[in-house]
């Protein structure tokens, strides 16, 4: 598989970039189907890669501020910035670096792991779109960039859509992440096992109910019952059931800081501002925040 765009990957993870530069990116999907992706340029920073037409940010949300600073040398007056990341509020940070009519935002519905340099393991959705994104503010430049990205993703084998209004799709991903990311990290279970347990499923329902209330108040109507029906389908259909989501990897495997502040923490903040009680999200945010601040003090069996 080769790319059909002039694409530069910039990452300070030197071993990862070196491996991709030498051999391409080994991309494993569907439990073992392997593709060797080639044709990339690589760099450890954006300092010397020139001005880009489009800059895509796919970092952890707690790394976005630093990534924006690092990307400054490749951002010109007509560069379109794109966030394809988990969490709420990423587009607001991009708008501070470029005008709203030059910012796209969205997210994917596929889980990923990076087990070693140059290798990515992904769990795509069983069917349908893998990536959804839209413009913060429509303009000829933003719409042209969105249409081109849609074409490139689709031609590359990643079904995606550039939406007039991406918010329903973004909220769907955010609520799914608010549900399974922290619960998997706290309970040490995969999504399928959380939903098989009466207590785990009960926790999921409470988180979803609060998130849907907040989403509705923010102008994106969602009902918890309909969302839970779709969530159960995704867990039972092989999309997210059999891997540990990123927050579980952060907490259980790598002892890293998580994205809790832009997931459940953001739901809690929105809830307070809107007068909507969010006790489950409040408690989950406190638990994960406590865990990630005290890795060095935790019991080691």
Positions of predicted regions on the chain:
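Conserved N-terminal Rossmann-fold NAD(P) cofactor-binding segment
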Residues: 6-52
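Rossmann-fold dinucleotide-binding core
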Residues: 50, 86-169, 173
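Aromatic pocket-lining residues of Rossmann-like dinucleotide-binding sites
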Residues: 1-2, 177
């Amino acid at each position: 598989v080769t790319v059909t765009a002039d694409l530069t990957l910039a990452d300070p993870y030197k071993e990862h970039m070196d491996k991709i530069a030498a051999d391409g990116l080994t991309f494993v999907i569907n439990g073992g189907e392997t593709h060797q992706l080639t044709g990339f340029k690589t760099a450890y920073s954006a300092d010397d890669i020139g001005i880009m037409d489009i800059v895509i940010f796919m970092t952890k949300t707690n790394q976005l501020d630093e990534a924006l600073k690092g990307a400054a040398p490749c951002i010109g007056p007509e560069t379109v910035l794109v966030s394809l990341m988990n969490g709420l509020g990423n587009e607001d940070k991009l708008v501070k670096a470029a005008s709203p009519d030059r910012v796209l935002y969205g997210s994917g519905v596929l889980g990923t792991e990076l087990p070693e340099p140059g290798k990515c393991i992904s769990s795509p959705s069983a069917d349908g779109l893998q990536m959804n994104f839209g413009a913060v503010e429509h303009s000829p430049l933003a719409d042209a960039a969105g249409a081109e990205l849609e074409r490139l993703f689709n031609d590359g084998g990643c079904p995606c859509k550039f939406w007039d209004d991406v918010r329903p799709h973004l909220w769907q991903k955010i609520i799914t992440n608010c549900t399974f990311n922290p619960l998997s990290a706290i309970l040490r279970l995969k999504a399928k096992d959380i939903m098989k347990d009466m207590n785990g499923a009960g926790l999921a329902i409470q988180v979803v109910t609060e998130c849907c209330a907040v989403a509705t108040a923010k102008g994106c109507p969602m009902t918890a019952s309909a969302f839970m029906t779709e969530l159960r389908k995704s867990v039972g259909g092989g999309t997210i059931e059999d891997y540990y989501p990123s927050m579980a990897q952060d907490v259980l495997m790598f002892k890293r800081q998580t994205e809790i502040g832009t997931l459940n923490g953001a739901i809690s903040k929105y809830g307070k501002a809107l007068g909507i009680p969010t006790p489950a999200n409040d408690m989950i945010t406190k638990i994960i925040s406590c865990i990630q601040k005290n890795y060095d003090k935790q019991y080691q069996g």
